[in-house]
Structures are given as C-alpha cells and as structure tokens.
C-alpha cells in the first residue's frame, strides 16, 4: 500500500469514527479515557474542560496516544494508533467549528470559560487491520 492510500484510509477512519481513547501521562504512567474526536486533515481535536486531569496532564507532559476506529465486533476493523503532542487551544473560532448541542451536558455553551479544545498534532500514525498482514505507518 502506498503512502497516499495509507493516508486516505487513515482519513476514512477519522471521518467515520468519533469516539476513541485518549491516553495522557500521569505521574509517569499512561492514563486513558474515552473521548469524542474531530479532525481537520490529520490534526485531531477533542473538547474538554480546563478543570480536568487531562488538561493538567497535558500541561505537564504533552505526549498523548489515541486509538480510534473499532466498530462493534472488533475483529478485522480498521483502526488507527496516533502518537502525538497535544496542546490546549482556546480559540473561539475552533470552539465555533466543533460546538454541538451534545456538549451542553458538560458546558454552558461554546462561550463557557471552562471549555477548551485539545489539539493533537500527530508524530506517528499507524493504520491497523486495513487488509495488510502487519500495521502500516503513515510517513509524516
């Protein structure tokens, strides 16, 4: 599979799967939780509160890992493993772009001062279970 095909399959996974796990580093150990993800190209975003452990963990260590793509069965589903650096983005424009009424459960609107967006810039993306016998990496 060539790099363009790998990139397209990675983007397909990102387009069709919004819930995955985000791992941060807490006291030198992985700390994972489910999150909702959005993307623009290969840059991945997820909303959170600035008052969460994950925001504090990212301030202390920006290294993160994302798993995204499994469907219900979990056998043979294409998914991606993304290792990258996260930063807290407080852009009103970005909040407007990803705001959804589904977030009202946690926030008092897109102008809630606790709402921040985690912006993840991938450093390594591996495509898994996409018809290959072994994982394939997207060159970044």
From Swiss-Prot:
Name the Gene3D superfamilies for this protein. Electron Transport, Fmn-binding Protein, Chain A (2.30.110.10)
Record keywords:
Stress response
Which Pfam families does the annotation name? PNPOx_N
Q: Which InterPro entries match?
A: Pyridox_Oxase_N, Split_barrel_FMN-bd, Stress-Dev_Protein
**SUPFAM superfamilies given in the database record:** FMN-binding split barrel
Conditions for induction: By heat shock, salt stress, oxidative stress, glucose limitation and oxygen limitation.
Please list which residues make up the signal peptide: none
Q: Which domain of life is it from?
A: Bacteria
Q: Which PANTHER family match?
A: PROTEIN BLI-3
* The protein's name: General stress protein 26
């Amino acid at each position: 599979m060539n790099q363009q095909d790998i990139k397209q399959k990675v983007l397909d996974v990102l387009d069709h799967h919004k819930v995955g796990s985000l791992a941060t580093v807490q006291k030198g150990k992985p700390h994972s939780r489910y999150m909702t993800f959005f993307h623009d190209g290969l840059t991945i975003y997820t909303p959170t509160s600035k008052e969460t452990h994950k925001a504090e963990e990212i301030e202390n260590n920006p290294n993160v890992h994302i798993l995204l793509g499994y469907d219900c069965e979990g056998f043979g589903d294409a998914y991606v493993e993304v290792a990258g650096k996260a930063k807290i983005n407080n852009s009103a424009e970005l909040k407007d772009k990803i705001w959804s009424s589904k977030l009202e459960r946690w926030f008092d609107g897109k102008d809630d001062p606790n709402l921040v967006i985690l912006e993840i810039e991938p450093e390594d993306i591996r495509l898994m279970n996409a018809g290959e016998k072994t994982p394939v990496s997207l060159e970044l």
